């Protein structure tokens, strides 16, 4: 579930593939492209954790970065390739996603 269109903050970052949610998330989290994380499913290799700012919601096919808790399972998210080839900050449900800690290895 997406809570409205949110705020568009960009498009496909330079150097990212056509399907760029994983690439955009790696730039947001690590400050640069991590090629192995371009595939959304690869984020599921990180340890599971509880939702918190800076953690990542992942499933096969999509990934986004948690920014701020709204209520219940709704979080403001940095969501690259969130539709129309745009990157948005908008409210997203965590339903159907696994929350992982990309800084734990």
Model-derived features: positions:
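Aromatic- and glycine-rich peptidoglycan recognition patches
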Residues: 5-11, 69-105
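Secreted/periplasmic proteins that engage bacterial cell-wall peptidoglycan
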Residues: 1-69
